[in-house]
């Protein structure tokens, strides 16, 4: 069997960093990263980006050396992705924060609304209902992170956790401050508005969970294989007939319901910002599906049926 020689150079300086001799033809990029780490332990595999061209795209971990457009002496270019952190840790941190922060305002701990309101309770039923809905939402997210989601990428840059937490934690504090404020005014149309909003919220939360379960069943544990998601017998998954990312559709719907329930401007703004970001993600996933699968259903839109 003919072995390969792999030379790894810095993508910026072109400096030679490592020379690997007698590499198996069936070796994957993941295995090459592990070999590279032995000579440069400060760059663990998750921190490495290897590519065929200094300005090219990163090679996938599952790419096999002999299937790449290289000779028996291959040159790969290395870029440092920076310190990495697992997606599970990021999500748990992102979602635990809003859950805890919101409850601080709900229980009116000292130094928030003034001494006379310390640990007092709102007289409005909608305030207590909003707390239950908000808490349920983030507890659901935490449990899904631990037991449902399967991540195609194991890590993300450490710096992103600060940006993400600022977004989630900041908005949670902002909306919680107004919803739990002693001077909070209930929705204009009273109980009927709250009931309608609660129905929207519950339906969308069930829908979101159903989509996450369907996506989980689509990818075997430990696998990175992608398949076209289709509706199942669960009616909540039928939205797959019309959109590529119904989990985002239901997520936006949940926050719209919460905004109607609380009639609170910060919640409406959070819904708008979230919708904008999820639309970007949905369009990206939709393009990936179209590129990867020639038989992808043509009727589907990224996030909103027939529109967007």
Swiss-Prot record:
Keywords on this record? Acetylation, Endoplasmic reticulum, Fatty acid biosynthesis, Fatty acid metabolism, Lipid biosynthesis, Lipid metabolism, Membrane, NADP, Oxidoreductase, Phosphoprotein, Sphingolipid metabolism, Steroid biosynthesis, Transmembrane, Transmembrane helix
- Residues that the record marks as modified (N6-acetyllysine) are 22, 60
EC number(s): the record gives 1.3.1.93
Task: Tell me which domain of life the UniProt entry assigns to the organism this sequence originates from.
Answer: Eukaryota
Q: In which pathway does it act?
A: Lipid metabolism; fatty acid biosynthesis; Lipid metabolism; sphingolipid metabolism
Entry's transmembrane regions: 87-106, 125-147, 159-180, 190-216, 246-262, 265-292
Side of membrane Lumenal, spans: 107-124, 181-189, 263-264
Known function: Involved in both the production of very long-chain fatty acids for sphingolipid synthesis and the degradation of the sphingosine moiety in sphingolipids through the sphingosine 1-phosphate metabolic pathway. Catalyzes the last of the four reactions of the long-chain fatty acids elongation cycle. This endoplasmic reticulum-bound enzymatic process, allows the addition of 2 carbons to the chain of long- and very long-chain fatty acids/VLCFAs per cycle.
Listed name of the protein: Very-long-chain enoyl-CoA reductase
């Amino acid at each position: 069997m003919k072995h390969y020689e792999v030379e790894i150079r810095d993508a910026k300086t072109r400096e030679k960093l490592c020379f690997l001799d007698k590499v198996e033809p069936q070796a994957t990029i993941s295995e090459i990263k592990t070999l590279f780490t032995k000579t440069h332990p400060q760059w663990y595999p998750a921190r490495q980006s290897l590519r065929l061209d200094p300005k090219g795209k990163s090679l996938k971990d599952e790419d096999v050396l002999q299937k790449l457009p290289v000779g028996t002496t291959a040159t790969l270019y290395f870029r440092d992705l920076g310190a990495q952190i697992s997606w599970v840790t990021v999500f748990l941190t992102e979602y635990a924060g809003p859950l805890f922060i919101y409850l601080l305002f709900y229980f009116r701990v000292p130094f928030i609304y003034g001494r006379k309101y310390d640990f007092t309770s709102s007289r409005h039923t909608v305030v207590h209902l909003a707390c239950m809905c908000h808490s349920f939402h983030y507890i659901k997210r935490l449990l899904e992170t631990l037991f449902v989601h399967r991540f195609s990428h194991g890590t993300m840059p450490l710096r992103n956790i600060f940006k993400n937490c600022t977004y989630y934690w900041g908005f949670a504090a902002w909306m919680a401050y107004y919803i739990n404020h002693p001077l909070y005014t209930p929705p204009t149309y009273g109980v009927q508005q709250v009931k309608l909003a609660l129905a929207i919220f519950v339906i969308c939360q069930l829908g979101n969970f159903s989509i996450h379960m369907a996506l989980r069943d689509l990818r075997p544990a430990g696998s990175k294989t992608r398949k076209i998601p289709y509706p199942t017998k669960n009616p909540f998954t039928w939205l797959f007939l019309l959109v590529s990312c119904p989990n985002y559709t239901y997520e936006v719907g949940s926050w719209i319901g919460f905004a109607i329930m609380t009639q609170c401007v910060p919640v409406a703004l959070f819904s708008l910002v979230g919708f904008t970001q999820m639309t970007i993600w949905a369009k990206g996933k939709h393009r990936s599906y179209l590129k990867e699968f020639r038989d992808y259903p043509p009727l589907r839109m990224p996030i909103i049926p027939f529109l967007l």
